Design a protein with these regions (language model features):
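Edge beta-strands of extracellular beta-sandwich domains
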Residues: 25-36
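Alpha-helical scaffolding within the catalytic cores
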Residues: 165-177, 203-211, 243-255
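Surface-exposed loop and adjacent secondary-structure segments within mature catalytic domains
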Residues: 54-99, 120-170
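Single conserved hydrophobic/aromatic residue that forms the stacking wall/gate
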Residues: 1-8, 12
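Catalytic cores of secreted or luminal carbohydrate-active enzymes
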Residues: 249-328
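Short, aromatic- and glycine-rich surface loops/edge beta-strands on solvent-exposed regions
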Residues: 14-24
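Substrate-gating cap/lid alpha-helix
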Residues: 127, 228-269
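Loop/turn elements at helix/coil->beta-strand transitions in domains of secreted/extracellular proteins
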Residues: 36-37, 70-72, 120-125, 181-185, ...
Length: 328
């Protein structure tokens, strides 16, 4: 942030760097790049690696893994950590993109970073802090959750019933150590676990975004997110309970894009699976998030990076005409 645009471009071209710290005992960091850093968070559809989950592959993953060698894309996965106490450090290490590293890395994040790197021709760093099945509440602080009385925070670690759903535990364990890290923005893929609490999601997600921005003290940084893809949630609904229409959750997600500045939503209505909550088309998710970043954050012109948004309907005799905004 202290360098001019021309100075940054010069730094990017003269890569990689070696950085030496010396307080009497030298510490050398080698193979350092200067580029764009994005935080990638959410639940299993953000966490899902390029190699896929058991019996749940990622579309075209084999060929994309084989072609993934690119020292200008750097990958960091935050180790799963669930706790009621805010942490100051995380476990993990930076790795260059290669078949051996990409196969275990978030598919959505990788496809996002690959396109951003390709179009901008600058190094891209990706930090993934995600946990499958995690609730929105888990990525928030106790103060932010005061407005949501249904979010119950345990008194002690032994009272934690769910390591990935309990309010505050993933914010404390996986996000708090990253606060203050200079980054360009966030991509987010979450909402499936909140599908049956859609009535609070728009307010809660808005609170999360504003809270993260307040903690980071880097202004209204870009925050782009995926709308949940189609899936038959009756499969995971308890016997005897009513199946809740997930259109309510998607509507809540759509509201956030219009109430919170510098956000954008990637629609995935054409990229889901009726019987699979982890759709294989992760390239669609990652690249739609990248299109948002490229057009809204980096100013790339000539393409429409935003997903179509419902505008209204008109009924003429026996015909219903549906109109959309941003349908280019």
């Amino acid at each position: 942030h202290l360098l001019s645009r021309r100075q940054r471009q010069m730094c990017i071209r003269d890569r990689p760097y070696t950085v030496t710290f010396d307080d009497g005992t030298p510490k050398v960091l080698s193979n350092i790049l200067i580029g764009e850093l994005w935080l990638c968070s959410g639940q299993s559809n953000m966490e899902m690696p390029m190699k896929g989950f058991k019996n749940q592959p990622v579309e075209n993953a084999n060929m994309d893994i084989l072609r993934s060698r690119n020292p200008e894309i750097r990958l960091f996965t935050v180790k799963r950590t669930s706790t009621l106490t805010p942490q100051n450090d995380v476990t993990g290490s930076w790795k260059e993109a290669s078949p051996a590293t990409v196969r275990d890395f978030s598919a959505t994040a990788y496809y996002f970073g690959r396109l951003v790197n390709e179009i901008l021709d600058v190094p891209v760093g990706l930090i993934v802090a995600a946990w499958g099945g995690s609730a929105c509440e888990a990525w928030m602080t106790a103060d932010w959750l005061k407005a949501f009385p249904d979010a119950k925070i345990p008194r002690s670690e032994t009272d934690i019933k769910s390591k990935n759903r309990t309010p505050t535990v993933l914010y404390n364990g996986m996000l708090h150590p990253l606060i203050g890290l200079t980054m360009k923005g966030v991509i987010w893929y979450q909402g499936e676990d909140n599908w049956n609490r859609a009535h609070t999601y728009a307010d809660m997600f808005t609170t999360l975004i504003n809270g993260w921005r307040t903690e980071w003290k880097q202004g209204d940084f870009p925050f782009y997110y995926c709308q949940i893809a189609p899936y038959d949630y009756g499969i995971i609904t308890e016997r005897g309970k009513e199946v809740i229409n997930t259109a309510y959750l998607r509507e809540a997600q759509a509201q956030v894009e219009h109430r919170v500045p510098n956000t954008g939503m990637a629609v995935l209505l054409d990229a889901g699976m009726e019987k699979g909550i982890h759709p294989p088309r992760k390239q669609v998710a990652g690249e739609r998030l990248a299109l948002l970043a490229l057009t809204k954050t980096y100013g790339i012109e000539g393409v429409n990076g935003e997903s179509p948004y419902y505008k209204g309907i008109e009924i003429k005799n026996d015909t219903v005409i549906v109109s959309f905004e941003r349908a280019g």
